Amino acid sequence: MAKEKFERTKPHVNVGTIGHVDHGKTTLTAAIATVLSKAFGGEAKAYDQIDAAPEEKARGITINTAHVEYETANRHYAHVDCPGHADYVKNMITGAAQMDGAILVCSAADGPMPQTREHILLARQVGVPYIVVFLNKCDMVDDAELLELVEMEVRELLSKYDFPGDDTPIIQGSAKLALEGDEGPMGKEAIMKLAEALDTYIPTPERAIDGAFLMPVEDVFSISGRGTVVTGRIERGIVKVGEEIEIIGIKPTLKTTCTGVEMFRKLLDQGQAGDNVGILLRGTKREEVERGQVLAKPGSITPHTHFTAEVYILGKDEGGRHTPFFNNYRPQFYFRTTDVTGSIELPKDKEMVMPGDNVTITVKLIAPIAMEEGLRFAIREGGRTVGAGVVAKILA
């Protein structure tokens, strides 16, 4: 099979493997890449290539993740696999690799284990919308009833965390057999079934350009005779000259009109997701807009101060705090382009949070920020990152 160049014609979907240590996540990742590259083209990756995951930084946090790409008949997938449990926690909370769906790997020989549960909970908290299950090591279980039992346990666990356990596709197989070239129902056939489940069960994600217009404010200038220009990178959607937009966050929401879009000193009639632009605002004063606010389509996003979040607190060796923090700890929360002070309320059963922990917290900010569930942020003290988080639920 000749190597084909990367065709952007197929829709692109981001997935990743989650599940307990040693249940076969990396073996499955290698098996999928190997089997699908033979079936649909692309490049196979060996197990040890995936396991030696390079370090990357996301929001000031070092994470090891391996990236693999593969294709099915209908789609192009980017797949992330993490070597260690801590890397999963960090990856999911920082959104370093935002997942449109996850492949939960569970060993049929062991059944659900503590990290199986923890990864499902994390997936729920950070907003991974779909989970497909691969019941691995089925070649080691002779008893069909036992397989059924494990499958039931996994479905119950998914339902417990508000995933549709009864409707979730569960594929039985053996990643090891598939990787070794076994063509049978446990090997290649299981991987092909998994690919089909990914194609049909995980919907094609909305592209950034199709969303409601949103641009975080990075800088504000006053240009004599022209008015106020706000610069930034459009996160999603399209803004057209003449459209009404809202300025949201920090201060009371203001309505204004876009009277011009500028990119590389050229005037455009519209700006779209991914563009670094200057947006000219009619009748808006320079001091009415500041970094940390967003420009957005009216009514599409609202400002909030009170929310729950799933956070990861950096360990001492990662440049984080050296000491635990307690209830009412007041760091800065860095949303998009600015810091806002807020106080942290810990869960009732938690007296303190140690460096290296992940925990669910409740936050009250001193100023409102345009937010929605799934928004990422960094936790900082005097400009250095001490943690990362994601908005789980907006309270007020």
From Swiss-Prot:
Protein's UniProt name: Elongation factor Tu
GO cellular component term, pick one: cytosol
Annotated EC: 3.6.5.3
Binding site for Mg(2+): T26
Organism whose genome encodes this protein: Polynucleobacter asymbioticus (strain DSM 18221 / CIP 109841 / QLW-P1DMWA-1)
G1: region residues: 19-26
Role: GTP hydrolase that promotes the GTP-dependent binding of aminoacyl-tRNA to the A-site of ribosomes during protein biosynthesis.
CDD domains noted in UniProt: EF_Tu, EFTU_II, EFTU_III
Quaternary context: Monomer.
Binding of GTP, residues: 19-26, 81-85, 136-139
Cited InterPro entries: EF-Tu_GTP-bd (IPR041709), EF-Tu_GTPase (IPR050055), EFTu-like_2 (IPR004161), EFTU_2 (IPR033720), G_TR_CS (IPR031157), P-loop_NTPase (IPR027417), Small_GTP-bd (IPR005225), T_Tr_GTP-bd_dom (IPR000795)
Domain of life of the native organism: Bacteria
NCBIfam families: EF-Tu, PRK00049.1, PRK12735.1, PRK12736.1, small_GTP
Keyword Nucleotide-binding applies: yes
Subcellular locations according to the entry: Cytoplasm
Region G2: start-end pairs: 60-64
UniProtKB keywords: Cytoplasm, Elongation factor, GTP-binding, Hydrolase, Magnesium, Metal-binding, Nucleotide-binding, Protein biosynthesis
Gene Ontology molecular-function annotations: GTP binding; GTPase activity; guanosine tetraphosphate binding; translation elongation factor activity
Region of interest (G3), ranges: 81-84
Boundaries of every tr-type G domain copy: 10-206
